[in-house]
């Protein structure tokens, strides 16, 4: 299986399955002398880890990360950084009844058709469990970006049909929904409770923002910065659409509305483009939105086929998120950080 490495200079290779022994990552291309410790990476992992609230999956994984290489006396050495996380709360028996069935809406069918074999326990490699290592690697990328004054934050901007206004950035990490609006918490709670009671799931929109960038990051044509961001975000499990800036809303706009005018004193007067023009950063905030589909692992029966091609019915009884988009916030932040640190190092190599 190829496709397990991300990046050009700052590269991340991950391995591991949902119900395997461990998850691991190798980060190569990280500059030397960057202060780094397990506790720092753990802060990001704790934002993503399952079982933290009644609104997400009840699988309880501590997600304790161990640095096995690339760091000496608290600083990166410039050699590959090895990270490992042990899986501790697998319940593979939850999947024994569907080991020969393809769960509708999951990668079971396509993995089996491509490889002729699949790990049916929690989806194996296709599980969102894999994203723990992305978040760990993203923590390192964030550390480098912070040195250059670049900050990344994300928030849940919509759950189902419930749109959530951005009010208070500081509130994002103070609630289980990663929303920036304290007044919207009761509505989110009611919605998730209702969905879970129905044995169903719901989609979500996540917005991720990068601030403090200089103009000139990224490259034109096939290596456009927005293309790299879209590629990164679409690699996240359950993401079905990505937009930059105003995104699909620009369809209904006129050119006189959408163009971001510039003046000498005020600079850009708007940011409809989401901080990127011609594939290169403008120096404004980079803004991307991700659409997460509702998870297909639900208690309601669904029609499918088994490995022999016979019609069957599937009910997934494992522990699952009623809304996967909620825990998608730190993952989206990590992927944006990985894109930007890679582009930053590429830009520096051009200038050097």
UniProtKB/Swiss-Prot annotation:
EC number: 4.2.3.5
The protein, known as: Chorismate synthase
GO molecular-function term, one example from the UniProt record: FMN binding
Keywords: Amino-acid biosynthesis, Aromatic amino acid biosynthesis, FAD, Flavoprotein, FMN, Lyase, NADP
Reaction it catalyzes: 5-O-(1-carboxyvinyl)-3-phosphoshikimate = chorismate + phosphate
Co-factor note (free text): Reduced FMN (FMNH(2)).
NCBIfam families linked to this entry: aroC, PRK05382.1
Pathway in which this enzyme or protein is active: Metabolic intermediate biosynthesis; chorismate biosynthesis; chorismate from D-erythrose 4-phosphate and phosphoenolpyruvate: step 7/7
Complex formation: Homotetramer.
Gene3D superfamilies given in the database record: Chorismate synthase AroC
Family: Belongs to the chorismate synthase family.
Organism: Francisella tularensis subsp. holarctica (strain LVS)
Keyword Lyase tagged: yes
Chain sites annotated for binding FMN: 125-127, 237-238, 278, 293-297, 319
One Gene Ontology biological process: chorismate biosynthetic process
């Amino acid at each position: 299986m190829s496709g397990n490495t991300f990046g050009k200079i700052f590269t991340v290779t991950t391995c591991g399955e949902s119900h395997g022994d461990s998850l691991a990552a190798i980060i190569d291309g990280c500059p030397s002398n960057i202060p780094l410790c397990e506790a720092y990476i753990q802060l990001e992992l704790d934002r993503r880890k399952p079982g933290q609230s009644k609104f997400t999956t009840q699988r309880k994984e501590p997600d304790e990360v161990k640095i096995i290489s690339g760091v000496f006396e608290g600083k990166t050495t410039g050699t590959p950084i090895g990270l490992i996380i042990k899986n501790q709360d697998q319940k593979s028996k939850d999947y024994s009844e569907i080991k020969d069935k393809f769960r509708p809406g999951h990668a079971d069918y396509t993995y089996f058709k491509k490889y002729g074999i699949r790990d049916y326990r929690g989806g194996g490699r296709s599980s969102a469990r894999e994203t723990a290592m992305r978040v760990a690697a993203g923590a390192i990328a964030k550390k480098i970006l912070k040195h250059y004054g670049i900050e990344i934050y994300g928030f849940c901007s919509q759950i189902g049909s419930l749109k959530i206004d951005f009010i208070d950035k500081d509130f994002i990490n103070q609630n289980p929904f990663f929303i920036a609006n304290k007044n919207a918490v009761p509505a989110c709670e009611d919605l998730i409770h209702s969905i879970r009671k129905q044995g169903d799931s719901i989609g979500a929109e996540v917005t991720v923002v990068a601030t403090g960038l200089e103009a000139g990051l990224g490259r034109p044509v096939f290596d456009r910065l927005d293309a790299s961001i879209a590629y990164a975000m679409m690699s996240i499990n359950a993401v079905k659409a990505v937009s930059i800036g105003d995104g699909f809303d620009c369809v209904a706009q006129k050119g006189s509305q959408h163009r971001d005018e510039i003046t000498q004193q005020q600079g850009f007067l708007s940011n409809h483009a989401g901080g990127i023009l011609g594939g290169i950063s403008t120096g404004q905030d980079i803004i991307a939105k991700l659409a997460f589909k509702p998870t297909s692992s639900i208690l309601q029966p669904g029609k499918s086929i088994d490995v022999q091609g016979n019609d069957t019915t599937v009910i997934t009884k494992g522990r699952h998120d009623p809304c996967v988009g909620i825990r998608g916030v730190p993952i989206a932040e990590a992927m944006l950080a990985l894109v930007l640190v890679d582009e930053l190092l590429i830009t520096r190599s051009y200038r050097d």
